[in-house]
Amino acid sequence: MATMTKKKLISTISQDHKIHPNHVRTVIQNFLDKMTDALVQGDRLEFRDFGVLQVVERKPKVGRNPKNAAVPIHIPARRAVKFTPGKRMKRLIETPTKSS
């Protein structure tokens, strides 16, 4: 399974649409910056058919150290980003591909 990096994404979009990579890089970086800013402010990002990104509060909890299960580990409350895939994405991911 391959990893799609920002560099690969820029290259692919640049080739597909015959746009200079620097222009694509600027747009993608701006898009990522705006998404990050929105999440930091607590906004919910919804992309129809793709999914939803939102900040959730994780409650504090007690965990276990696998090397010494007798000693509890206190995990503090924190904020985290949660991604919920959209219907179309779920359907596409659940459908096996020919290469699988």
Curated annotation (Swiss-Prot):
CDD domains: IHF_B (cd13836). Coiled coil: none annotated. One of its GO terms (cellular component) is cytosol. Keywords: DNA condensation, DNA-binding. Pfam families: Bac_DNA_binding. GO terms for molecular function: DNA binding; structural constituent of chromatin. InterPro entries: Hist_DNA-bd, IHF-like_DNA-bd_dom_sf. Transmembrane segments: none annotated. Disulfide bonds: none annotated. One of its GO terms (biological process) is chromosome condensation. Belongs to the bacterial histone-like protein family. Histone-like DNA-binding protein which is capable of wrapping DNA to stabilize it, and thus to prevent its denaturation under extreme environmental conditions. This is Probable DNA-binding protein HU. It comes from Chlamydia trachomatis serovar D (strain ATCC VR-885 / DSM 19411 / UW-3/Cx).
